[in-house]
Amino acid sequence: MSAQPNPKAFPLANAQLTNQILDLIQQAQHYKQLKKGANEATKTLNRGICEFIVMTADVEPIEIVLHLPLLCEDKNVPYVFLPSKTALGRACGVSRPVIAASVTTNEARELNAQIQAVKNEIEKLLI
């Protein structure tokens, strides 16, 4: 593994935000508000049910997730890169690495406050 994250992976979350996002992803998985994988994330963006997108910076080649930031900017959805695909896979509750995930909207809204807090943090990174 390379020590330096890919420079194309912008914005990259710091350690505190990474932990906050991974915790929220675990809860979103519990409430069935999580889609795993680049293709599923693309579908949620196109359907307009996406709260925010998480991608990983250690994807090889990085180009397989770089279509997502463009879509996010078109749809006005916040997005962020995390350092580790293995950690994202664990948070998603699967045994394999996950390169992208999408937290989706839900009528029940148990996670609304946490989702809004994370979206605000991500938007601060994008400025």
UniProtKB/Swiss-Prot annotation:
UniProt-listed SUPFAM superfamilies: L30e-like (SSF55315)
Listed GO biological process terms: maturation of SSU-rRNA; mRNA splicing, via spliceosome
RNA-binding as UniProt keyword: yes
Cellular location(s): Nucleus, Nucleolus
The keyword Ribonucleoprotein appears for this protein: yes
Entry-linked Pfam families: Ribosomal_L7Ae
InterPro entries the record matches: eL8/uL1-like, H/ACA_rnp_Nhp2-like, Ribosomal_eL30-like_sf, Ribosomal_eL8-like_CS, Ribosomal_eL8/eL30/eS12/Gad45, Ribosomal_eL8/Nhp2
Keywords: mRNA processing, mRNA splicing, Nucleus, Ribonucleoprotein, Ribosome biogenesis, RNA-binding, rRNA processing, Spliceosome
UniProt GO cellular component terms: box C/D methylation guide snoRNP complex; nucleolus; precatalytic spliceosome; small-subunit processome; U4/U6 x U5 tri-snRNP complex
A molecular-function term among this protein's GO annotations: RNA binding
Function: Common component of the spliceosome and rRNA processing machinery. In association with the spliceosomal U4/U6.U5 tri-snRNP particle, required for splicing of pre-mRNA. In association with box C/D snoRNPs, required for processing of pre-ribosomal RNA (rRNA) and site-specific 2'-O-methylation of substrate RNAs. Essential for the accumulation and stability of U4 snRNA, U6 snRNA, and box C/D snoRNAs.
Xref: PANTHER family: RIBOSOMAL PROTEIN L7AE FAMILY MEMBER (PTHR23105)
Subunit organization: Component of the U3 snoRNP particle. Binds to the C'/D and B/C motifs in U3 snoRNA. Component of the 25S U4/U6.U5 tri-snRNP particle, a subcomplex of the spliceosome. Binds to the 5' stem-loop of U4 snRNA.
Family: Belongs to the eukaryotic ribosomal protein eL8 family.
Protein name per the record: 13 kDa ribonucleoprotein-associated protein
Species, as recorded: Cryptococcus neoformans var. neoformans serotype D (strain JEC21 / ATCC MYA-565) (Filobasidiella neoformans)
